[in-house]
């Protein structure tokens, strides 16, 4: 296929149009009075969402140059979501500002490599300043405030705080759908282990890249499944039972995986494979934990148990399975005496353990088995509302976990304003062009505050001016339209979310400003002219 190349200012202009297409769409959602964006969905009703990365993911532009710019900004949102679980809109707004300022500097004759050096220096300094300002999450109130700010709902904040109180800060919390209109919290028996699906082709929900199984059978073994013939007899029984099957094995050969995936895609049976968690003796014990929870017979190779001899009675049962890329959650609705015995055995082993390493592993297993799983059952009047509510709760959960990891900073964009005030005259370089890179990052720190105020119906410029005059921790409450002590009002952000937003925005901006050419594929129309399309 032929290629078309744009150079210099022309290339940067096209990329910038793509950046603006995404950023201008996403930034309307920022802050407590941010608006929603409606997304067309093929074969289903439109989605109305407030989540930056979900919006950015859906945007495809006809012009390939503009689309490259858009996809680079989507990467900012996606990376921030992967690392911190929230803050995607803030990252997008920061990236747009940095890229605009960076391109202006390059077009005015600055050396892009030196400007890039300044951007990298400034972003690392901002990240350090944010960590220095971070306050540890000490109590339930902080957890509730973080979740409330992220979701834009006091009710959701309260439910997430209750969930963490019941299963612990490191406990397993999942979001599910309720059959009613109310959003409720339920704690059930279950555990989560750190292995996801063995192949992405098992995924049933492409949007969230998750597998959901209901009323599933469970095969638990420390065998390496090398041939399909080993498990054909039990698979035939599973097909007759018309129930989904979860296979948890030490390993499964690619050839076997291929056959299982092909049969799943054809609809022959519904099966998902995950590798066993842990390694060595600890792996065997974790597999036993899974077997006890699911009431499965553990197919143990040291006892010369063979997969070919498996009967239906050897398989376990589980009410619900949620499998993601990196973890699997098993949820049971019934209490088991065997599970209680297993928990007591672990407690005894911890008491008698003389090894720190062994004690740590035992404590982790005990926490997984005894902590249970908190289910936030989301209720709504319509499917559209349900999807939006689930996204908000998932974002709030991620934000809360990020806050527990790195602590919190004052919210409403104030933390970035304070860092701006500390660095605007102190972070200096002898090189003029490096300084331009520093300045464009530092100046961009004011943009989230501007956008939050603008979305709430206030003058962004006036609010930024007033923010600069406020004492530490005091700032603009966009929801109420007044200046308050933000910490006292519970307007806080996870440090990790804010820090990752700055780092990822600066990373893409630094790379984009060094771009001097853009290469795309093109189709020729009937007149043999280039068909590159226009922005759509």
UniProtKB/Swiss-Prot annotation:
This is Chaperonin GroEL. It is an enzyme of class 5 (isomerase). It holds the Pfam family Cpn60_TCP1. Belongs to the chaperonin (HSP60) family. Transmembrane segments: none annotated. The keyword Iron-sulfur does not apply. Signal peptide: none annotated. It catalyses: ATP + H2O + a folded polypeptide = ADP + phosphate + an unfolded polypeptide.
